[in-house]
Amino acid sequence: MTQPIDDGQVLLVEEEKTKLFKAITLRQAWYDTPCTPESFVHVIGEFSQTGQCVIDDHHNMLILHPDHLISATVVADSFGCLRRAVLQDRVKATSRANAPMLYGTLLHELFQEALKANTWDTEFLLDTIDRLLPGKFETILEINSTCEEVKEHMKSKLPELQSWAKIFVTAKPRADGLVRERNGQQSLMSINKLLDVEEHVWSPMYGLKGNIDATVQVTMQDDQGERTLTVPFEVKTGKNSSNAAHVAQTALYNLLLSNRYGKVTLLAFLERY
């Protein structure tokens, strides 16, 4: 049951296990949460001894229908346009292939194969490209290209891929393995173990699901010392490394993995075309 008040909306809820009634006050951005008498909600936060909980822009969270898992990608896409995110999820339309899309997909798959094998030498990478190309033959024809042209383009990307791996795929952080967080803090980082590839993660706590490119173990060194963390690793290709949807998606994946593994951090590899 909901009851509007001057500075928010009050939900009278029944806790599933204890059958006790409690009150949740929704304020600010949470005020318009479309709760109905039959809604299931999950509260991430604390209740007072009298059974009161205030949810606003700074305190606590409410997940509406957490049993209906929504793709983290769909949620992230909604930051740009709510309608677009819904339409993309419901209408599985396909657009014409283009060269950046093809090269981005190939780079994504090549990176994953190299990460799985922990092998970054030129011979292995070229052999992997040769194995990937037959599966992209129709797309190559659609963009009026040839396998030879596509392979040459991918060969031009190998030096920077190998340079990145030399710096970051190591047992211990190197002096040049510097990463900068969004708050400006700097750390040294190394990827020292691959835990999973294309990991499917479901989180009824947050009502989210996701398919994470790779889950890796990293070592971080900063002013607080050395830490070993389990992190989601997302391979992003495109023109805009500050894309709001990319940032939102990686933040949501961080939530998903924190639910499974505990405290984690986040990193992403970006390639521009």
What are these regions (language model features)?
Residues 104, 108-115, 254, 258:
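Short, amphipathic alpha-helical segments that act as regulatory/interfacial helices
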Residues 33-57:
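Flexible glycine-rich surface loops and low-complexity tracts that mediate binding to linear polymers
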Residues 81, 107-108, 214, 253:
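Conserved structural-core and active-site-/substrate-pathway-adjacent residues in large, well-folded domains
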Residues 1-9, 151-154, 158:
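Accessory interdomain/linker segments of ATP-dependent helicases and helicase-like nucleic-acid enzymes
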Residues 110-195:
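A non-catalytic, helix-rich entry segment at domain boundaries
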Residues 52-103, 109:
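Extended, charge-rich, solvent-exposed interface segments
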Residues 6-41, 189-273:
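Mg2+/Mn2+-dependent nuclease catalytic core
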Residues 99, 103, 107, 153, ...:
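Hydrophobic (often cysteine-bearing) scaffold residues that line and stabilize catalytic clefts
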